[in-house]
Amino acid sequence: MTSPEAWRGVTWGLVTAFLNWQLQNGYAVGTINGRLSTVKVYAKLATKAGAVDVGELAMIQAVKGFEHKERKHINDKRKAAGIDTRKGAKKAQAVSLTPAQAAAMLDRDTTTDTGRRDRLLLAIMLRLGLRVGEVAALQVGDFDLKHGELNFYRAKVDKTQTHKLDALTLEAARDYITQDAPAIGIIWRGSVKGHGLGKQGMSARAITKRVQFLGAKVGAVGLSAHDLRHYWATQAARNNTPLDRLQDAGGWSSLAMPGRYIEAAKIANQGVRLE
């Protein structure tokens, strides 16, 4: 519904009914909140185009989503009623990866072009924690091999960052860029079954499928690209990375998400004395 005319007749009551319909049909609370935000943005644009009344827009904007603290109560009620609680894009729970499994995934055959690409692909997610969309968008020119840095754009927070590459990631970047990467543009080349690497470009979906394939080889069945970011953040939190540094390095716009990793990394019974 990107055409303003398509929004004629959309009311706050319709928006509220849409929220309730999603609740009854098992959509995740986060997904519902995201869709509500999208509806409000488009309703505002439609109002500017004259398709939605200003008063109606005010009422639509007043429709509230669900706060994080409400989610458990909402989901408990839905479970009791036999309604699903996780219909949406994300998995209900991340697949946990051990340090040994992560190391095994990074141990690629660097005598092949596919192995060199996979090693860099995995290193960027496991060692730098980039989102899969950010990884897919990386350009050859984003890598400064001389200074060991990666300069890239984070669309989710609309900012460009520079990250220092650790020794493993820098080595992987040198191996792939000097031997296999395109001269300019998107750095990745897709796989051609039985023939190594093919044409330029890998979608976020293709990267996730590759991660899933490589994860299964080390016993991490169902692994996704987001799980690699989860692993990175978890390891950073467990090694006492300050909250503000984790927020910046992970490209989060608020302290809420990195704060969860810090909280989860705490030893719950630390300081408890029984004698």
Regions from the PLM with identified roles:
Residues 1-275:
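Conserved catalytic core of the tyrosine transesterase superfamily
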